[in-house]
Design a protein with these regions (language model features):
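Hydrophobic membrane-insertion alpha-helices, especially the h-region
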Residues: 1-11
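Long, amphipathic alpha-helical surface segments
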Residues: 12-49, 61-68, 74-93, 115-158, ...
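Surface-exposed patches in mature extracellular/periplasmic domains of secreted proteins
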Residues: 50-53, 94-103, 141
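Early exported N-terminus immediately downstream of N-terminal targeting peptides
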Residues: 54-56, 61
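Short N-proximal segments of mature Sec-exported proteins
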Residues: 102-115
Length: 162
């Protein structure tokens, strides 16, 4: 289920890694710890954010009101450190979900944690409600978040309706 999304991501990233490192990319990425895989996949799919992507910098970090980052001066190293810090923060936020915490952290990095956890104005997601009830069959709830600029990705809409 959820592994299908992860597998598709890993295959794309694997191809990129194999070209860069001159080795079998799939084998290379599977040798990485899960957190490192999440970092690689996030970098690959987020891409680099320049000034035109404000308030996002680096590999998709959203600048908070008290932060002073500039896309113009940010290095790849600084962005990598920031991405890892963000993912660790989200992993801690979802710690209660055990082995699903990294999956939820990467999703929260993309859609925001309150789209999952809820807030005063946003209800708690069905995905979180199912996990809290002990139901790990969350594939359809997970891919429901696969959209860009409010529109479902064409390759995902078929899976979501079937």
């Amino acid at each position: 289920m959820v592994m299908l999304c992860s597998l598709m991501a890993v295959c794309s990233v694997s191809a990129r890694i194999s070209r860069r490192e001159g080795m079998d990319g799939q084998a290379a990425i599977y040798r990485l710890p899960l957190f490192e895989r999440a970092v690689c996949c996030t970098k690959y799919f987020e891409g680099w954010h320049s000034e035109k992507h404000h308030p996002y910098v680096g590999w998709g970090h959203k600048i908070l009101p008290d932060e002073r980052y500039s896309a113009r001066t940010m290095t790849k190293r600084q962005a990598d450190v920031l991405l890892r810090k963000d993912l660790r923060k989200f992993c801690a936020m979802f710690r209660q979900f055990g082995k699903d915490s990294l999956l939820l952290a990467t999703l929260a990095y993309n859609v925001g944690p309150y789209r999952l956890l809820g807030s005063k104005t946003i209800p708690k997601s069905t995905l979180i409600k199912k996990l809290e009830a002990g139901d790990r069959n969350i594939y359809h709830e997970y891919i429901a978040f696969c959209s860009y600029k409010g529109k479902r990705h064409a390759m995902r809409s078929e899976e979501h309706t079937s």
